[in-house]
């Protein structure tokens, strides 16, 4: 099929979907391209971001956790966004696209529940019916978000197949869309999946990096040495990275979930420890068994528990423009506690992975003068029960 935009990032990406979905993807691409050129659409999107979601979000300088080092550390506060995470940005854009295409329903998948909450709030705001697929395990560990979705009128459908996590929810959502695309828009929650989703999601998240660049220049008079973001599918990270890709002096660091440790096999780090394959409509690195089956990923944070990664991240990794590292559950938990106790901010466990790597950079080189920005992609309200149970089991509370 001929596309209006390049469906690949280097060798990664593409449109590996059943033929029945090609017209829906083509319609979506056409709507997106025309919307990007439409001042009325852009004004409506900008208005929602400002007056409904609460943009721009703050860039907060850490006051205490850098003590004894020469690091200056800022947090891009996506946790302050309405809905509690960066997810709200792009769902408002996609919901407006759905209306533009004349759709009346939204289908979504969710892991941590943040994309589900964002999809539910955008659907409620714009008068769209919403059904959300969620792995049964995630329904259990993210009960506050499940209730939030239902409060806003969304139907939450637990998925019991496979590992009962995000990858299975993605499969069910795509299956639903195959039979309902004439009336429904599939609101994919990350910068992955078949073209044009990785491009759409990046463009509807790129204000994160644009604001960060403007704010850091205003506060420090220079660009950061590195911007750091957690990577599951990779939408918050690509939103942060996009405006810095052409700034060679700025390091781009993506942090994958190391789970119980890479050596245990229980992790979610396909970029550095997976193999390229076809999954979820795209060609990208993914966690696979020896015979090519998709392997179960694992992370303490439901939102990073995904066995593949967005194709643009795979490309940035392959050309050496971005560095990808991993952080274990324990390291993320320590960073979570550090930010709570020393800065009075409760971060999402996903974001805690990015913070943990920044703290590692700071502690390994305390004498090094460096300016770092961490994308604090979401707040940790949804994780307090998970953290409580772990700390209680350890006798820390």
From Swiss-Prot:
Recorded E.C. number(s)? 4.2.1.20
Q: Name one GO molecular function term.
A: tryptophan synthase activity
Xref: PROSITE patterns = TRP_SYNTHASE_BETA (PS00168)
Task: List the Pfam families hit by this protein, alphabetically.
Answer: PALP
Pathway(s) annotated for this protein in UniProt: Amino-acid biosynthesis; L-tryptophan biosynthesis; L-tryptophan from chorismate: step 5/5
Cofactor(s) needed for function: pyridoxal 5'-phosphate
SUPFAM superfamilies recorded for this chain?
Tryptophan synthase beta subunit-like PLP-dependent enzymes
One Gene Ontology CC term in the entry: cytoplasm
Q: Residues of the signal sequence?
A: none
List of residues that carry N6-(pyridoxal phosphate)lysine = 87
Q: Which InterPro entries match?
A: Trp_synth_b_CS, Trp_synth_beta, Trp_synth_beta/beta-like, TrpB-like_PALP, TrpB-like_PALP_sf
Which key words tag this protein in UniProt? Amino-acid biosynthesis, Aromatic amino acid biosynthesis, Lyase, Pyridoxal phosphate, Tryptophan biosynthesis
The answer to whether keyword Lyase applies is: yes
Catalysed reaction per UniProt? (1S,2R)-1-C-(indol-3-yl)glycerol 3-phosphate + L-serine = D-glyceraldehyde 3-phosphate + L-tryptophan + H2O
What is known about its subunit structure?
Tetramer of two alpha and two beta chains.
Please explain the role this protein plays, according to its UniProt record. Answer: The beta subunit is responsible for the synthesis of L-tryptophan from indole and L-serine.
Q: Which family does it belong to?
A: Belongs to the TrpB family.
What the entry lists under PANTHER family is as follows: TRYPTOPHAN SYNTHASE (PTHR48077:SF3), TRYPTOPHAN SYNTHASE-RELATED (PTHR48077)
**Any idea what this protein is called?**
Tryptophan synthase beta chain
């Amino acid at each position: 099929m001929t596309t209006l935009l390049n469906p690949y990032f280097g060798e990664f990406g593409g449109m590996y979907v059943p033929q029945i979905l090609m017209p829906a993807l083509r319609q979506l691409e056409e709507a997106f391209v025309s919307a990007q050129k439409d001042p009325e659409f852009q004004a409506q999107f900008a208005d929602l971001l400002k007056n409904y979601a609460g943009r721009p979000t703050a860039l907060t300088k850490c006051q205490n956790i850098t003590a004894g080092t020469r690091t200056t550390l800022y947090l891009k506060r996506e946790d302050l966004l309405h809905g509690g995470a960066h997810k709200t940005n792009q769902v408002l854009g996609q919901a407006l696209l759905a209306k533009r295409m004349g759709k009346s329903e939204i289908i979504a998948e969710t892991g941590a529940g943040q994309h589900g909450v964002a999809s539910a709030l955008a659907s409620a705001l714009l008068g769209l019916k919403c059904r959300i697929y969620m792995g049964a395990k995630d329904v259990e560990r993210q009960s506050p978000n499940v209730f939030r979705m239902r409060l806003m009128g969304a139907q939450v459908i637990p998925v019991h197949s496979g590992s009962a996590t995000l990858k299975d929810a993605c499969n069910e959502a795509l299956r639903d869309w195959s039979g309902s695309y004439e009336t429904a828009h599939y609101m994919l929650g990350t910068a992955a999946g078949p073209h044009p989703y990785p491009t759409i999601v990046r463009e509807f998240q790129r204000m994160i990096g644009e604001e960060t660049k403007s704010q850091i220049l205003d506060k420090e008079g220079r660009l950061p040495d590195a911007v750091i973001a957690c990577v599951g599918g990779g939408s918050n990270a690509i939103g942060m990275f996009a405006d810095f890709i052409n700034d060679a002096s700025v390091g781009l660091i993506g942090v994958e979930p190391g789970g119980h440790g890479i050596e245990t096999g229980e992790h979610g780090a396909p970029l550095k420890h997976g193999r390229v394959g076809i999954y979820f409509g795209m060609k990208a690195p993914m966690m696979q068994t020896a015979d090519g089956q998709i392997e179960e990923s694992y992370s303490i944070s439901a939102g990073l528990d995904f066995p593949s990664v967005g194709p643009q991240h795979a490309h940035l990794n392959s050309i050496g423009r971005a560095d990808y590292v991993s952080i274990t559950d324990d390291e993320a938990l320590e960073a979570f506690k550090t930010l709570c106790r020393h800065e009075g901010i409760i971060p999402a466990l996903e974001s805690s992975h990015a913070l943990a790597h920044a703290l590692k950079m700071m502690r390994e080189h305390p004498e090094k003068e460096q300016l770092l920005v961490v994308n604090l992609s979401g707040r940790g309200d949804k994780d307090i029960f998970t953290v409580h149970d772990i700390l209680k089991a350890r006798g820390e509370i």
